[in-house]
Amino acid sequence: MGFTTGREFHPALRMRAKYNAKYLGTKSEREKYFHLAYNKHTQFLRYQEQIMSKTKEKKVGVIFGKFYPVHTGHINMIYEAFSKVDELHVIVCSDTVRDLKLFYDSKMKRMPTVQDRLRWMQQIFKYQKNQIFIHHLVEDGIPSYPNGWQSWSEAVKTLFHEKHFEPSIVFSSEPQDKAPYEKYLGLEVSLVDPDRTFFNVSATKIRTTPFQYWKFIPKEARPFFAKTVAILGGESSGKSVLVNKLAAVFNTTSAWEYGREFVFEKLGGDEQAMQYSDYPQMALGHQRYIDYAVRHSHKIAFIDTDFITTQAFCIQYEGKAHPFLDSMIKEYPFDVTILLKNNTEWVDDGLRSLGSQKQRQQFQQLLKKLLDKYKVPYIEIESPSYLDRYNQVKAVIEKVLNEEEISELQNTTFPIKGTSQ
């Protein structure tokens, strides 16, 4: 039952008026109720007109960008634009060929998919999701910028129609785009920080020299740039202490070994209850720690133990490898892997059982065998001196942060120096 758009009674009000006219006594009383019903209907129409008027007056803005990657300059522009409109639509533009070239010319660890870029934007603006809307525009087949404005504008207008919004203003930081926006989209153009006075950064600068512009990369995009350094070795090889030292010195994050926490939380602190089905749970818990460390890292994140080590323990204690761990090893590679030789003093902390020299050597060989099997390049630190190990790993990290080549260090060992201390 819909309301009428003209001045005649709504059917429900007409029926109510007829009812009152039939069952209420005098003519004057009937006229009074007809008049009352008419007034109510008139008030409703005025209210409806006010709502429609407000809807028409709503100011809608739009922003276009590749966001490859998104950075704080983009975020600032979006929030400034949002303060000037009632509703803002952010369009993430993609072109398969162009985006592939951008990736190959970058220092990004892996190529972000369209879904990755949409996810960045949706995560950043999730608390304004009813006012800031994220859309995707496919630009494949359209001549490259700055050409192709006519074809591009037609695709944009189609998107506006499909997503049911009509912007009146477009926001941009590129002065050269003002005239084309006005000509091809017929929209008012507002330039936001065109001289880069507040945020002197661009996606191009971040792609090519990410560490130099690290402070401009939001945590959502950092996993595509942050370096991960995995420190692995057998029991009591000094991994955890070394990881903590490195994270503190380089002012960044680390991911602790989740397996120890799993034993305390799920097994009551005793590994005798460990079983084959526990290893995937430990790997998933460790991956959560790694994800958090990378997202909040300062250029580099240190990882205490990798999935190859988890697989080695599974083989050692359960007599066979786990296919889930095999998948984790392949799916989550690390940028740098450092293997500590198992030649430091063995300390029994209640969760260790491979304490004999023979057991330690056998486990070390198993780690090397698995590293070779999965074709993981690694740097082996042989010195039993904790100080030497610390300084040698620091030297590797300095090379990584300076974006120097470390391939000559991989699959080699540092010379033994000093004694255990």
Curated annotation (Swiss-Prot):
GO cellular component terms given for this protein: cytoplasm; plasma membrane
Main location: membrane
InterPro entries hit by this protein: Cyt_trans-like, NAD_biosynth-regulator, NAD_NadR, NadR/Ttd14_AAA_dom, NadR_NMN_Atrans, NMNAT_NadR, P-loop_NTPase, Rossmann-like_a/b/a_fold
Function according to Swiss-Prot or TrEMBL: This enzyme has two activities: nicotinamide mononucleotide (NMN) adenylyltransferase and ribosylnicotinamide (RN) kinase. The RN kinase activity catalyzes the phosphorylation of RN to form nicotinamide ribonucleotide. The NMN adenylyltransferase activity catalyzes the transfer of the AMP moiety of ATP to nicotinamide ribonucleotide to form NAD(+).
Compartment annotation: Cell membrane; Cytoplasm
Effect of residue 292 to I: Almost no effect
Assembly: Homotetramer.
Effect ascribed to mutating residue 352 to A/C/M/N: Complete loss of RNK activity, no effect on NMN adenylyltransferase activity
UniProt organism field: Haemophilus influenzae (strain ATCC 51907 / DSM 11121 / KW20 / Rd)
Protein EC: 2.7.7.1, 2.7.1.22
Chain sites annotated for binding NAD(+) 1: 64-67, 71, 98, 139-152, 172-174, 199-201
Gene: nadR
Name of the protein in its database record: Bifunctional NAD biosynthesis protein NadR
Positions of region (Nicotinamide mononucleotide adenylyltransferase): 57-224
GO MF entries: ATP binding; nicotinamide-nucleotide adenylyltransferase activity; ribosylnicotinamide kinase activity
Location of region: Ribosylnicotinamide kinase: 225-421
